[in-house]
Amino acid sequence: MKLTLWTYEGPPHVGAMRVATAMKDLQLVLHGPQGDTYADLLFTMIERRNARPPVSFSTFEASHMGTDTAILLKDALAAAHARYKPQAMAVALTCTAELLQDDPNGISRALNLPVPVVPLELPSYSRKENYGADETFRALVRALAVPMERTPEVTCNLLGATALGFRHRDDVAEVTKLLATMGIKVNVCAPLGASPDDLRKLGQAHFNVLMYPETGESAARHLERACKQPFTKIVPIGVGATRDFLAEVSKITGLPVVTDESTLRQPWWSASVDSTYLTGKRVFIFGDGTHVIAAARIAAKEVGFEVVGMGCYNREMARPLRTAAAEYGLEALITDDYLEVEKAIEAAAPELILGTQMERNIAKKLGLPCAVISAPVHVQDFPARYAPQMGFEGANVLFDTWVHPLVMGLEEHLLTMFREDFEFHDAAGASHHGGKAVAREESPVAPADLAPAATSDTPAAPSPVVVTQASGEIRWMPEAERELRKIPFFVRGKAKRNTELYAAHKGVCDITVETLYEAKAHYAR
């Protein structure tokens, strides 16, 4: 156990809540002390759901610790069934309740309720949230789904979408459209939007689409064994992956590949004149394994970025992520410590970060552009608009999402480049009002360690980092710093790094304007 101000994943019972909240007519009963979890806040504030999550609590207190707390769980189960009348129920223990070793399986059986009650085994001290969601969904599918006759037409199940998932709602809609172009209907989408009665119909489909391995792979593997349903292995995030996904579906079903790329813009836009701003941009990627692997492929092969670092916080995806990282000559970072992630980002010196809400905070601290690609996320990443990550429309959304932080418009570049101009500095006023511009008095450049931090409105100018060499330390002269700030900030970091490398190679301690332009000429060859 450790004290931290950020965690990428909650305990396993949070994953159970995500599955229960995604479904209809299912009630989850959590056995735990008062204040041990916070279901309402997660789903009504962050995801902005218009209904409270279907979660009930036994809520024992300190005064109950010397008594039989199992009675409280028994009463909570009976009360939840009487009040909500669900089609099925699930029961789980929170972290603290696990220490008491109450038996939810035996208690639920003794009640003899008229609906299925699925006990969940969620080891709170060795596993985390994604495992909890995956195991909860698997347990529900195992308890309710049975083999049955297939539908006359080719159908599939969509597996893995949950509450609090990153763009899961829109991904389901986009994948449904993709499959419809091949004449394939969706039999059941689960857990998102499904009821326990819907889970009983899972066996009717011809195959399963595994949308999110983190939360649906165990259920997909169970259905493969129990109902003889194959499942897809490719996640359709990005243009190439979407085409590969449709080819995989064609191989499973025997249907011809039919695609509608009439609305796809990402490939052309990536190859357009603006691609000169994109090609070679250094990018660091961190998040859940599925989204990181997909993002690395898009960044390297579809947009033209250089992937300089990648990692994930969920250890269940460590093996496939290490395999993917090796393709780019990288060693994968597998950690759930945000401080380690921050150190890795600083060491990699990227020009763009793709990550979670935590990486957005790290990017603000370091003055780097960032785009969110993976849960956990905050309220702004649950948009009211349609914004999928999967399919061809998802590729368009990803292109916009990644490029916008780089500030493609020339306005900001020009404002930064001419910040010191006599007509455009802050004290001159608006030039289009006909004011009389007066040249501002030059002030000496503050030392690197005393320079004020960049505001949120002004892109951070990279303060000269002192690099210690055998011959002494490298310093930026004031006139060189001023010249560096005239370089558009979307390439300023690269120019700064190249200049310092050139100076170190030449044994130059003081970087002047001449050094800056010599380095530019050297690396332009």
From Swiss-Prot:
Co-factor requirement: [4Fe-4S] cluster
Cofactor: how and how many bound: Binds 1 [4Fe-4S] cluster per heterodimer. The cluster is bound at the heterodimer interface by residues from both subunits.
Binding site for substrate: G409, L410
Annotated metabolic or biological route of this protein: Porphyrin-containing compound metabolism; bacteriochlorophyll biosynthesis (light-independent)
Keyword Manganese attached: no
Enzyme kind, highest EC tier: oxidoreductase
Low complexity compositional bias, start-end: 444-464
Alphabetic keyword roster: 4Fe-4S, ATP-binding, Bacteriochlorophyll biosynthesis, Chlorophyll biosynthesis, Iron, Iron-sulfur, Metal-binding, Nucleotide-binding, Oxidoreductase, Photosynthesis
Family annotation (SUPFAM superfamilies): Helical backbone' metal receptor
GO molecular function, one term: oxidoreductase activity, acting on iron-sulfur proteins as donors
Region (Disordered): 433-464
Phenotype when changing L410A: Almost no enzymatic activity
Source superkingdom: Bacteria
Residues of the active site: D274
One BP annotation, GO: photosynthesis, dark reaction
Record bears the keyword RNA-binding: no
Binding annotation for [4Fe-4S] cluster: D36
Entries under InterPro entries matching the protein: ChlB/BchB/BchZ (IPR050152), LI-POR_suB-like_C (IPR013580), Nase/OxRdtase_comp1 (IPR000510), P-CP_red_C (IPR042298), Protochl_reductB (IPR005969), Protochlorophyllide_Rdtase (IPR016209)
Catalytic activity, reaction form: chlorophyllide a + oxidized 2[4Fe-4S]-[ferredoxin] + 2 ADP + 2 phosphate = protochlorophyllide a + reduced 2[4Fe-4S]-[ferredoxin] + 2 ATP + 2 H2O
EC id: 1.3.7.7
Family from the record: Belongs to the ChlB/BchB/BchZ family.
Subunit structure: Protochlorophyllide reductase is composed of three subunits; BchL, BchN and BchB. Forms a heterotetramer of two BchB and two BchN subunits.
Protein name, per record: Light-independent protochlorophyllide reductase subunit B
GN (gene name): bchB
